[in-house]
Amino acid sequence: MEKITLAPISAVEGTINLPGSKSLSNRALLLAALAKGTTKVTNLLDSDDIRHMLNALKALGVRYQLSDDKTICEVEGLGGTFNIQDNLSLFLGNAGTAMRPLTAALCLKGKTESEIILTGEPRMKERPILHLVDALRQAGADIRYLENEGYPPLAIRNKGIKGGKVKIDGSISSQFLTALLMSAPLAENDTEIEIIGELVSKPYIDITLAMMRDFGVQVENHHYQKFQVKGNQSYISPNKYLVEGDASSASYFLAAGAIKGKVKVTGIGKNSIQGDRLFADVLEKMGAKITWGEDFIQAEHAELNGIDMDMNHIPDAAMTIATTALFANSETVIRNIYNWRVKETDRLTAMATELRKVGAEVEGGEDFIRIQPLPLNQFKHANIETYNDHRMAMCFSLIALSNTPVTILDPKCTAKTFPTFFNEFEKICLKN
């Protein structure tokens, strides 16, 4: 297995231009495909998850032109639903941001009735999709499971989504609601969506609603408990769509600045629509010095205090707090993160296991993790398992800010969202 060893880093300094956001990139491509008109999507992320969406759209008859560096994509909108070849099978890797929205969009009524299969990597077949399928079936969709009940692969017939009143469980993943919301305007009737349980990761729903607005569709949001969407609408291309820099990817660089120097990230700022921009607020609560601009966020070192906080609103960036916590002067507790368990891997178990390897004292619960700080000279050199999870690899690069090297196994797993991560991280590092 490939591995990379990061030598101890004495300080960090510099500016990082962030790659485009994964969440925004895949939403933008799907909305552009369904819209009337041509959309030029700029600052698109070049990564595995985006490639899976692009390959799927091509197979579904969407025409697009991708620039040589794969960051600009001109998409010719279909002005409505997909025309599906019968018995087409789409392989979506481990890309939840492709699997969930496409599951809903492919239920919409096509010109001719066809069946399509959605599948992916072995881990994708372990990631739940039951709540989305249940909600779509309530709205009249025709979906069946091909292997295990509640999980991909799926067979979908494009008979249409009728709309009406739909209840959806919001407690596992906000992507289920995102998928339903993005397809609802093309349903045959109006849709009223009621959320059962607590809706997780609300800021990701804000991203979805803002992007639907950019493509000409309004949704009535009643305190995240009920959403009303008019049916029989069309998305309208905004002609150009700029993808913001990835706020989740920003977290590793901002944390490095807070721990040991000063780092600025560009491509995201105080008006960002991404919830993970709030990661900088968490660093500030811990004591770091944060500066916000229109198009940048900067984090500067100060003494860091532990924190006890509900981080349900920033589940991806919360992982970065888990490794940052080792450099604080008191205990950190990250709460209400059950949905870590249904991500690329069971992140709660993985995080606790790997933190212990570097010498940390950790308590992992069903939906929380408690982490004790670790003096710089007590870190152990460990081989970090990444579980084919891009965020595990990136989070644990911060361990090199101690007096100890860290070895990351399978570093290429960052290709899911940030193929050049380790090159970029190296740029801000001053070695001993």
UniProtKB/Swiss-Prot annotation:
Gene Ontology CC entries for this record: cytoplasm
Broad class of enzyme this protein falls into: transferase
Entry's localization field: Cytoplasm
Xref: Gene3D superfamilies: Enolpyruvate transferase domain (3.65.10.10)
PROSITE patterns: EPSP_SYNTHASE_1 (PS00104), EPSP_SYNTHASE_2 (PS00885)
Pathway(s) it belongs to: Metabolic intermediate biosynthesis; chorismate biosynthesis; chorismate from D-erythrose 4-phosphate and phosphoenolpyruvate: step 6/7
GO biological process, any: aromatic amino acid family biosynthetic process
Keywords from the named record: Amino-acid biosynthesis, Aromatic amino acid biosynthesis, Cytoplasm, Transferase
Species the sequence originates in: Haemophilus influenzae (strain ATCC 51907 / DSM 11121 / KW20 / Rd)
Source lineage: Bacteria, Pseudomonadati, Pseudomonadota, Gammaproteobacteria, Pasteurellales
HAMAP family attached to this UniProt entry: EPSP_synth
Positions with a binding annotation for 3-phosphoshikimate: 22-23, 27, 173-175, 201, 316, 339, 343
Protein name: 3-phosphoshikimate 1-carboxyvinyltransferase
NCBIfam families named in the record: aroA (TIGR01356)
Listed GO MF terms: 3-phosphoshikimate 1-carboxyvinyltransferase activity
Binding site for phosphoenolpyruvate: 22, 96, 127, 175, 347, 391, 416
InterPro entries: Enolpyruvate_Tfrase_dom, Enolpyruvate_Tfrase_sf, EPSP_synthase, EPSP_synthase_CS, RNA3'P_cycl/enolpyr_Trfase_a/b
Subunit annotation: Monomer.
